[in-house]
Amino acid sequence: MAKLLSFSNESRESLERGMNALADAVRVTIGPRGRNVVLEKSYGSPDIVNDGDTIAKEIELADPFENIGAKLIQQVASKTKDKAGDGTTTATVLAQAMVEEGLRNTAAGASPIELRRGMEKAVAAVVASLNQRSQSVSGDAIRQVATVSSGGDEEVGRMVAEAMDRVSFDGVITVEESKSLATELEVTEGMAFDRGYSSPYFVTDGDRQICEFENALLLLTDRKISSVTDLVPVLETVQKSGSPLVILAEEVDGEALATLVVNKNRGVLQVAAVRAPSFGERRKAALADIAVLTGGQVISEDRAMTLDKVTMEDLGRARRITISKDSTTIVASDDSKEAVSARVASIKRELDNTDSEYDQEKLNERIAKLAGGVAVIKVGAPTETELKNRKLRIEDALNATRAAVEEGIVAGGGSTLLHISAELDALTSGLEGDQKTGVEIVQRALSAPLRQIAENAGSNGDVVVDRVRNSGEGFNALTGNFEDLMNAGILDASKVVRLALQDAVSIASLVVTTEVVVADKPEPPAPAGGGGDPMGGMGGMDPMGGMGGMGMM
């Protein structure tokens, strides 16, 4: 494909235009009085959302150079979302402010490399101060963090706090759509473990990069599956039932994995493969625990069982299974409580009979996974559009509270970053030239989140920033008052603030040091014309491997 090239200031300015286009769409959502953004969908009704990462992913610009700038901001939002689960809009606002200041200085002749070094020194100093200010989570702080992260929704804050209280900070909490209008909390039998899908082609939700099945069947085995021949009978049976299938095995690879992927993507079979948790004998124990939870059998040579003899009665059943790239959550049906209780009692007896600290630790982990259960927040709303928006807010609140448990909390509303900015004066006094300017770029950008929160609340951003800087207090955008935000319960997770800043500086420093941008040259639109599907139709299972009537061999 032919390429387009852009050089020097022209290249950086085109990147900035693209970054500004996306950032301006995202920044209106920050704070408790942030606005919504309407996203047109290729099918169905539009989405009305308040989530920075979701908005960023939907934006693509016509100009190829500007679109690269937009993709860079998307990367900021995506990285922050992946690592912290929240703070995407804060990261976007910070990155935009730093890029604007940085490019203004490079255009005036500043050294991009020295600017970057100064910016890196500044962010290190801010992170150190942030860690000193951070306080551990206690009392009502969980509810307050969740409320702030969900845009001031008190009900969401209360529900997230209750869910964490019911299953502990380390417990499994999931969010699903409710059949009713009400949003409810339910604690049910379930389990989570650190193993993800064997192939990204199993993903069913591209936005969240997860595979999610309702009322799924589970094939549990401690064997490695490479040949699809072993799976033919059970796959034929499952396809006739119309239920999704998740295969938990030592490993699924080769012909077996390729065939599953192809037929899943053709819509012939809803299927996913996951590597079983743990190793060796502990893997067998983990699979046995999952079998008890789901009412299935572990297909094992130790029990003289083979895959080609599997029946529907041997398969486990789960109300819902959610699989990400590195974790799996199983929500069991309600009729597994007695079996789980008996299994937990059996493991406790085993615990009483061992003196090994390592074995005791692993047995306690198994008990916690089985007995802890899964808290399910069922989200209800009058319309599908409102339901999606509310679900995103609850997921943000959950992620923020988990981050708060990890690294503590600081005063929210953008006030902490603004107050820390004053401490950078000591750093600039020991520097000179463009490194000093790099520190000042970050220092000025630290006021951007508070300024935008104030403007979204209908206040003058510059006036609010000056008053907060001089008073030492914070701005409560919900009430319009200036007060101690820690006492008012306006809290941010330290981890979210830290990662938002670090990711913003990372991208901004790269843009400042950019000299050339290379983009794909847009191809002219193809002439209109007919033609059949180049795939040639589904025709049942893919010929890579067949399955009786479905074409598998």
From Swiss-Prot:
Protein name: Chaperonin GroEL 1
Subcellular location: Cytoplasm
InterPro entries linked: Chaperonin_Cpn60_CS, Cpn60/GroEL, Cpn60/GroEL/TCP-1, GroEL-like_apical_dom_sf, GROEL-like_equatorial_sf, TCP-1-like_intermed_sf
Stretches the record annotates as Disordered: 520-543
Entry's EC annotation: 5.6.1.7
One Pfam family recorded for the sequence: Cpn60_TCP1
Subunit-structure text: Forms a cylinder of 14 subunits composed of two heptameric rings stacked back-to-back. Interacts with the co-chaperonin GroES.
GO molecular function: ATP binding; ATP-dependent protein folding chaperone; isomerase activity; unfolded protein binding
The UniProt record lists the keyword Disulfide bond: no
GO cellular component: cytoplasm
Function, in words: Together with its co-chaperonin GroES, plays an essential role in assisting protein folding. The GroEL-GroES system forms a nano-cage that allows encapsulation of the non-native substrate proteins and provides a physical environment optimized to promote and accelerate protein folding.
Binding site for ATP: 29-32, 86-90, 413, 476-478, 492
SUPFAM superfamilies, sorted: GroEL apical domain-like, GroEL equatorial domain-like, GroEL-intermediate domain like
Taxonomy, superkingdom: Bacteria
EC top class, as a word: isomerase
Designated gene of the protein: groEL1
Gly residues composition bias: residue spans: 528-543
PANTHER family given in the database record: 60 KDA HEAT SHOCK PROTEIN, MITOCHONDRIAL
Annotated keywords: ATP-binding, Chaperone, Cytoplasm, Isomerase, Nucleotide-binding
GO BP of this protein: protein refolding
HAMAP family referenced in this protein's UniProt entry, alphabetically: CH60
Organism of derivation: Synechococcus sp. (strain CC9311)
Gene3D superfamilies (alphabetical): GroEL, GroEL-like equatorial domain, TCP-1-like chaperonin intermediate domain
UniProt keyword Signal present: no
Family per similarity comment: Belongs to the chaperonin (HSP60) family.
Residues of the signal peptide: none
